[in-house]
Amino acid sequence: MDNRTAFLNTVAQALGRPLRREPQAEAAPVNNYANERLTELSPQQRCDAFVQFASEVMLAQCELTHEAQAPEAALRLCQQLGQQPVVVSGDSRLAELGITERLQRECNAVVWDPVRGAENIVQAEQAKVGVVYAEYGLTESGGVVLFSAPERGRSISLLPESSIFVLRKSSILPRVAQLAQVLHQKAQAGERMPSCINIISGPSSTADIELIKVVGVHGPVKAVYLIIEDC
């Protein structure tokens, strides 16, 4: 008998049972909330819950529009938030919606261009409004998900005074578990993962001091979710 077995025998005797060489099977979980919570909601119910939580708890402004009205809605929001200067993500989906061209024409918006390097960061720092396209929304937390890429710099939604997140209603997921499933499927399919995945829940805020919530401490003071009704 080696020292390890002798030691374990002593512990087992003290516990009043024989030495176990195989771990006991884990008890069946009481629930599977991590994967199933909020999945029973319809797309409309998810959107309603997302808007309610984001606006009431995360203090984000939520606006719904249709694809045809998206450029006008984005322009109106930029005007409310200070209009100029505006920096827009180089995301082709914003261009396809007509948002990029409209803001360039009406607000002299600058489009993030990886060729310009650090100049992009300076422009984002000086901008009143940053406009980005969100990959997903998360019902449970009222947050939006951003995938970084050379044409979609993180600074666009971090440095300007206000941020506008363009989000499709059909892309609102129940919670982060479903986002993990999407990422896993992409990885299994051999797709290249984004260099940075950000989950942003409303404007920057903190409640570290005496549990008093203060907004705009270390990032945008205002966050607007422009939700396109596509389902």
Identify the role of each PLM range.
Residues 1-231:
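The feature marks the mature, well-folded catalytic cores of soluble enzymes
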